Amino acid sequence: MNDDIKRLQEEYYAPLYLTPNTSRKAPQVQARAALMVAMAQHMTKTEVGKSFDRDHSTVVHHTGQHEANLFSWDGYEDKYLLAVRLCNTHLRYNSIEDKLKTIRIQIKRLEGLA
């Protein structure tokens, strides 16, 4: 796991007074789900899953349940908003850098065709 993701997870779980683990207890599942959905806006579902030692299908499941969770799962929305804020801080820059790298590669390839 890269340092940005590790730092993101530490900053996310600290105010929730949770230590990330693989428990199926509601507070852990809720926190994990909210963070996975927020991270999936900046990373592939496979990358998100790997950062939690989970398969991408877990991220797909949580993403699909997100809207329902916002309305029916007490505390989920607050966790999600915290996760979004932290992801925008920690992951947005990386996402932009990756896109710029791809564009630079495409420009070089196109210049080679000219």
Features from the language model and the residues they span:
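Basic, low-complexity segments
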Residues: M1-T22, K99-E111
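N-terminal globular core domains of eukaryotic regulatory proteins
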Residues: M1-L8, Q30, Q41, G64
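Short Lys/Arg-enriched helix C-cap and helix-to-coil transition segments
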Residues: N69-S95
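Short alpha-helical "recognition helix" segments of helix-turn-helix
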Residues: T46-D53
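Short, amphipathic alpha-helical "recognition" segments used to contact nucleic acids or chromatin
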Residues: P27-M43
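DNA major-groove recognition helix of helix-turn-helix
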Residues: H62-L70
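Helix-turn-helix DNA-binding helix
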Residues: D55-V60
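Heptad-repeat amphipathic alpha-helical coiled-coil interaction surface used
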Residues: V37-A40, Y93, L100, I107, ...
